């Protein structure tokens, strides 16, 4: 594999702030030369690749010792970027890592753009686009199941499936071309309408099956957006805090104290549940509270799941009935809170099974998790250990386009169109799938994707 010629880049690869270790990473042809200028220890040009080397970082202009470090020296092509890589392991801290980064830049490196290390890995053929995106998914994963899907994608499970399908499509196209250009050849199977239809239906079934994993994959990657709704002071914020096991929302006896939308994540059965505690939906003259109410209504419309909290110790109010009405078309769980008090709510007016809870006494909170599990996971068979999942919106959109293109081929065959006229749609399918792996992705898309990465990755 021939790597492209790039300048040498540098960035801090660890989160900013205090920590045990901070890492300044360099990648490029001059990585070793730049590091050698500021490192006092072994000659990095002579050490074995993939070794850690003890020494000190020295400012060559002043002779000042900046820090005691371990320098990782990795020579191309067996590195993440397929370039020479230096990783300076410093004591963690904003000042020391920044000063060492500035030294590297002063001696000839350029400050890396967000995601530029991974972008170089892609451009140099170390990873394809799906694997590069998986790197960010691993960083952002909130549960073990989300991380497992990202790791499988990084290992190439999706890439292999897409590449194998593209190769089969290419073989079919080649067969059609040979039949058109060299009809006298008997060694090649004739690309009849029946043969092409069988192949395209096979491709369509494969991609459709992959699309069926999208809902589960998206849930695992992004979580279930869950709006906690109810009139003011029924215990929404207390429920949020109970589920999170920590105080995040303002909990008082004063109606209207949650004036905005509060978002937090909780792990339910290995799946991230994005809990959105909304301001109580009611008529109010308070401008700030009005904004919170409008945001609550928006969160309700966009939620995958609605937890409607009612006060079991009070009769249903007009606001309760309004919330029951506007949430009836959603995935909804009705919670009767404050069951530690005498129950006066009219349960006969409630349209479905409810869960009786007492947030104050921590009663039946586990039943909420059980119901969520039944709603989303149990019947769907959430995770198959060896399955390949679609979870990325870009991938899902492109697979949908590829399926549409294959359907156009099959519709054309049913109408009796000649096979050679349908090459355009079959070729388009091949190109669309190439956008997923990056083989046919435009430069603008690649730049936009990597710009979403963090610095130093």
From Swiss-Prot:
Alphabetical list of SUPFAM superfamilies matching this protein: P-loop containing nucleoside triphosphate hydrolases (SSF52540), TrmE connector domain (SSF116878)
Pfam family, one: TrmE_N
Binding site for (6S)-5-formyl-5,6,7,8-tetrahydrofolate: 25, 87, 126, 457
Main location: cytoplasm
Subcellular location: Cytoplasm
Family annotation (InterPro entries): G_TrmE, GTP-bd, GTP-bd_TrmE_N, GTPase_MnmE, MnmE_dom2, MnmE_helical, P-loop_NTPase, Small_GTP-bd
Keywords tagged on the record: Cytoplasm, GTP-binding, Hydrolase, Magnesium, Metal-binding, Nucleotide-binding, Potassium, tRNA processing
CDD domains according to UniProt: trmE, TrmE_N
Free-text remark on how the cofactor is bound: Binds 1 potassium ion per subunit.
Enzyme Commission number(s) from the entry: 3.6.-.-
Enzyme class, UniProt record, top EC level: hydrolase
Biological process according to GO: tRNA methylation; tRNA wobble uridine modification
Entry-linked PROSITE patterns: G_TRME (PS51709)
Keyword Repeat found: no
Residues that hold K(+) according to the record: 233, 252, 254, 257
Residue ranges of the TM segments: none
Positions that bind Mg(2+): 237, 258
Disulfide bond annotation, renumbered to this chain: none
Protein family according to the UniProt entry: Belongs to the TRAFAC class TrmE-Era-EngA-EngB-Septin-like GTPase superfamily. TrmE GTPase family.
Protein's job: Exhibits a very high intrinsic GTPase hydrolysis rate. Involved in the addition of a carboxymethylaminomethyl (cmnm) group at the wobble position (U34) of certain tRNAs, forming tRNA-cmnm(5)s(2)U34.
Subunit structure: Homodimer. Heterotetramer of two MnmE and two MnmG subunits.
Protein name: tRNA modification GTPase MnmE
Annotated gene: mnmE
């Amino acid at each position: 594999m021939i790597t492209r010629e790039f300048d040498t880049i540098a960035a801090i690869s660890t989160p900013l702030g205090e920590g045990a270790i901070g890492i300044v990473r360099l990648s490029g042809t001059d990585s070793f030369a730049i590091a050698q200028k500021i490192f006092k220890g072994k000659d990095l040009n002579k050490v074995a690749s993939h070794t850690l080397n003890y020494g000190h970082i020295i400012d060559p202009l002043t002779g000042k010792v900046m820090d005691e470090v371990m320098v990782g020296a990795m020579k191309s092509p067996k590195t993440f970027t397929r370039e020479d890589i230096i990783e300076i392991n410093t004591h963690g801290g904003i000042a020391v890592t920044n000063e060492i980064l500035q030294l590297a830049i002063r001696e000839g490196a350029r400050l890396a753009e967000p995601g530029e290390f991974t972008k170089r890995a892609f451009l140099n053929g170390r990873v394809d686009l799906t694997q590069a995106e998986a790197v960010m998914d691993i960083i952002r994963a909130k549960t073990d199941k989300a991380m497992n899907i990202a790791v499988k994608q990084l290992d190439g499970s999706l890439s292999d499936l897409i590449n194998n399908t593209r190769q089969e499509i290419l073989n079919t196209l080649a067969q059609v071309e040979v039949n058109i250009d060299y009809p006298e050849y008997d060694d090649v199977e004739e690309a009849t309408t029946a043969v092409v239809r069988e192949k395209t239906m096979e491709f369509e079934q494969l991609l459709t099956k992959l699309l069926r994993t999208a809902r589960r994959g998206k849930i695992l990657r992004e979580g279930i957006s869950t709006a906690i709704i109810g009139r003011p002071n029924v215990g929404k914020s207390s429920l949020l805090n109970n589920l999170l096991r920590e105080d995040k929302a303002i909990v008082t006896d004063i109606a209207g104290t949650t004036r905005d939308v509060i978002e937090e994540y909780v792990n339910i059965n290995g799946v991230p549940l994005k809990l959105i505690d909304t301001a109580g939906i009611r008529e109010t003259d308070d401008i700030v509270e009005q904004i919170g109410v409008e945001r609550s209504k928006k969160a309700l419309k966009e939620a995958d799941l609605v937890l409607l909290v009612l006060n079991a110790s009070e009769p249903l109010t007009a606001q309760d009935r309004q919330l029951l009405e506007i949430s009836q078309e959603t995935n909804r769980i009705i919670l009767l809170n404050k069951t530690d008090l005498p129950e006066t709510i009219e349960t006969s007016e409630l349209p479905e099974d409810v869960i009786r809870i007492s947030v104050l006494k921590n009663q039946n909170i586990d039943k909420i998790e059980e119901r969520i599990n039944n709603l989303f996971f149990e019947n769907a068979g959430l995770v198959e250990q060896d399955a390949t999942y679609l979870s990325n919106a870009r991938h899902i959109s492109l697979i949908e386009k590829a399926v549409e293109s294959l359907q156009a081929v099959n519709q054309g065959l049913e109408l009796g169109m000649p096979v050679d006229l349908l090459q355009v749609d079959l070729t388009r399918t091949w190109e669309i799938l190439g956008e997923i792996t990056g083989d046919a992705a435009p430069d603008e898309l690649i730049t936009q994707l990597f710009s979403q990465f963090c610095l130093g990755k």
